[in-house]
Amino acid sequence: MTQLYKLLPFALILIVAQTFAQSFEFEDETIDFPLTTAGSTASEATSLVNLTDETLTVTGFEFFDIYNKAAFAQPSTQGLPNFSGTEELLVQFTPTHNIEHSSLMVVKVEGRGSRAIQLEGAAQYTDSFYDSTFDLSEEDLKLSLTDLTAINYQSLGYNTGRDVLYMQVDNEKVNGQNADVNRIVGVYTGEVREGYQNRGQLQSDGFNCEHSWPQSLGASSEPMKSDLFHLYPTESTANSVRGNTAFGNVSNPEWEVGGSKKGGNRFEPRDEQKGRTARSMLYFATRYYSSTGIDFTWLSGQEQTLKAWNQDYPPTEEELQRGENIGDFQGNRNPFIEHPEFANRISSFSNTSFPIADPQIYVSDPSVEMGFIDAGKTYEYSIVIYNEGNQFVSVSNFEIEDQSIATFKQDQGNVNLAPGQFIELFVEVTPISSDPASTDITFNTNIAGQQDQVIPIYLNGAVGINDQNSEFFALELFPNPTTGLLRLKWDPSQIKPHYVRLFDVSGALAFERKIDSQFSARLNVSQLKAGSYFLQLEHDKGQTTNRVVID
């Protein structure tokens, strides 16, 4: 889980030379969304401003997960624009959780790097019953849910509880599933019983009551024993096989019937039951969190699996209706049926819940890809460094190894980034020739295993292509720019080509073809996206690289 904090009043920026103009920027520092109902979508706009005299191309957008899901996104219809002045960008806010949301949108521009804008929005549930859970997480949320699950609760007693279970809640004739006769399904094996008239007949026909939380581990007394939110009808043999075995995934089953399995001291319900079992267990652990006599240590080894099942098998309409039906009889509600996302905001159900330390650093550009640029002209490339974890992260010792290729000025020295905080690093490049060149940006963090960070800088064809030719070989490319067909022509007395390849600006291979002709080749590149590419011709003397533009 990643918990985000609001950005400090300003973004920390590593500034380049004072006379240097930025390539592009956002018109706003923050996009603020109105209070939004969870599950609905709000839209707001900002503008991206091109500060150069060239047309720039947006190559991508980055958004970040909040509790395993992105709340902010781009409309699917927006695309990746080319822009020469001001370009309006729409951002959508579709929250799942009733919390304050604080995140980033990072926009990536070909050959000019990345910029970030802060995104802020709050969400609420339509049901005021859960208002007390707003913006809560961990132990605070768990205690709030413990209180909520006790509201209006009425213990039915075990006999009445089973009567309600068999004749009402899971009886498909009366629970909304429209069976013609009394009909019930065993949750583990899928076996069906029809035409029974009462609990006694059903029990005589091999069915009984499964306690998801075993009676022997704390569910043998009232009100736990008869709490319908963790009780299910089962075929009695399957119930005995499960016993008080912990839930989990089974790879080598000793027993398997109807999709459920047992093996390796774990019991795995069939897929139809996994999500319901998970939400029953999380409910029980929350509802009776303050009760005595319950073995919560038994739960600890199952929590991650139960959370995964809760997420992978969301509530169906039948489960939602089942929850309402139970509420009609015993008065309370299961919050994990109505809002399964609550589970992502609680790190531990078996112990006191604290955020799990999760230091993470995001670097927008793993390398600086300047492409082919003119000698003597100054260019800027911007990089976003973002603390997307939940711990403070220090970033320090910024250096560029070869400052004849690129420079930056770091005014404020080393930086401690709070969770949710970012910096923008601006790099200034002024090539003195058109020859390929490369160097590295280096810096350090205090994250274990990520202490030494390296961002390579490539310009004028050095982008991972490794030109090996030590002398010039004439290669004609036409038309360039091209809209689909590209012709290559060379002097066969100088070189004998073997392969031609096209790389995008990130260095990824986009096109490859074997060359059979002695003098020329025609390439159909109409399937490639518009943009700049590096054409590499592999021949008997090494490699020759040229820039190609596809319109």
Predicted regions and their residues:
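Surface-exposed binding patches on compact interaction domains or structured appendages
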Residues: 23-27, 52-90, 359-366, 390-426
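Bacterial Sec-dependent N-terminal signal peptides
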Residues: 1-25
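Domain-level detector of nuclease and nuclease-like folds
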Residues: 200-356, 367-371
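Residue-level detector of functionally pivotal "anchor" positions at catalytic/ligand-binding pockets or at interdomain
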Residues: 350-365, 458-478, 493
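Short, solvent-exposed loop/turn segments enriched in Ser/Thr/Gly
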Residues: 38-46, 87, 96-105, 375-383, ...
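Terminal connector regions
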Residues: 98-123, 434-460
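C-terminal outer-membrane/trafficking sorting elements
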Residues: 419, 468-478, 482-551
